[in-house]
């Protein structure tokens, strides 16, 4: 996915911001 910050914990980032599985990791960046 578009790894920008939360690439190490995709599951955490997806739940935190609620981003789709395709954009997992990019969520942590904002």
Swiss-Prot record:
Record's keyword annotation contains Plastid: yes
Keywords: ATP-binding, Chaperone, Chloroplast, Nucleotide-binding, Plastid, Repeat
Cellular location(s): Plastid, Chloroplast
A Gene Ontology molecular function term of the record: ATP binding
Disulfide bonds: none
GO cellular component entries: chloroplast
Extra facts: On the 2D-gel the determined pI of this protein (spot n9) is: 5.9, its MW is: 92 kDa.
Protein family (similarity comment): Belongs to the ClpA/ClpB family.
Functional note: May interact with a ClpP-like protease involved in degradation of denatured proteins in the chloroplast.
Name of the molecule in the record: ATP-dependent Clp protease ATP-binding subunit ClpA homolog
Species: Pinus pinaster
């Amino acid at each position: 996915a578009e790894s920008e910050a939360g690439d190490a914990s995709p599951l955490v980032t997806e739940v935190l911001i609620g981003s789709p599985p395709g954009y997992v990791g990019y969520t942590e960046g904002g």
